[in-house]
Regions:
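Pre-Walker A (Motif I) flank of P-loop NTPase domains
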Residues: 1-3
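A glycine- and Lys/Arg-enriched "phosphate-lid" helix/loop adjacent to the NTP-binding pocket
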Residues: 89-166
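The conserved Walker
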Residues: 10
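Short amphipathic alpha-helices and their capping/turn segments at secondary-structure boundaries
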Residues: 18-24, 56-72, 97-110
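Conserved nucleotide-sensing/catalytic segment adjacent to the nucleotide-binding pocket
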Residues: 45-93
Length: 177
């Protein structure tokens, strides 16, 4: 059993990947957490550059609540929340720094984090995510910088790429399933 998180900019296939992994017998007893952005948006929480410190705190609380489980597969991690916080226009720089300092405390709770490389993957409009390529690149840049900055707090970080089947093979090799 492990806490497994996937990190990556929007529209790289995190949710699709988690749903496919959930079908495998090795993950039968895992809690699967996906697509919380739509749910939270429907509660009235602003997303992307419109997000607020309250909104990002709710997103962080969602991720932390997932970490209360010993067997977890999630399509978002605390790193994702941190990366989007950095792009929120209404949050002051000092508040962003304080938020990141607090959020990083939970990174060590993941047993594995898989970063999904966005190279060659087109943005899909699901009605929730931002479809602007420049914004997507900023989020990916933030994610990479956060991984560099806080990598020492991450137990097992792996980069995966390719189509869903190739990604699953890479994950299973890492997890030794």
């Amino acid at each position: 059993m492990a806490r497994i998180g996937f990190v990556g900019t929007q529209s790289v296939g995190k949710t699709t990947l988690v749903k496919e992994l959930a079908k495998l017998p090795q993950f039968e007893y895992y809690h699967v957490a996906t697509e919380r952005s739509k749910y939270l948006r429907d509660l009235g929480i602003p997303l992307n550059t419109d997000s607020t410190i309250k909104g990002q705190t709710v997103f962080l609380a969602e991720r932390v609540s997932e970490l209360l489980r010993d067997n977890l597969i999630t399509d978002r991690t605390i790193i994702d929340v941190m990366a989007f916080t950095l792009e929120a226009k209404s949050i002051e720089p000092g508040v962003k720094a304080d938020f990141l300092y607090y959020a990083k405390q939970f990174l060590k709770e993941y047993d594995y984090i898989f970063y999904i490389d966005p190279s060659g993957i087109e943005i899909e409009d699901n009605g929730v995510r931002e479809t602007n390529n420049e914004f997507r690149d900023k989020i990916d840049f933030n994610i990479k910088n956060l991984i560099k900055s806080y990598g020492g707090l991450i137990n097992n970080l792996h980069t995966i790429s390719g189509d869903t089947d190739n990604r699953i093979r890479q994950i299973m090799n890492v997890l030794k399933f």
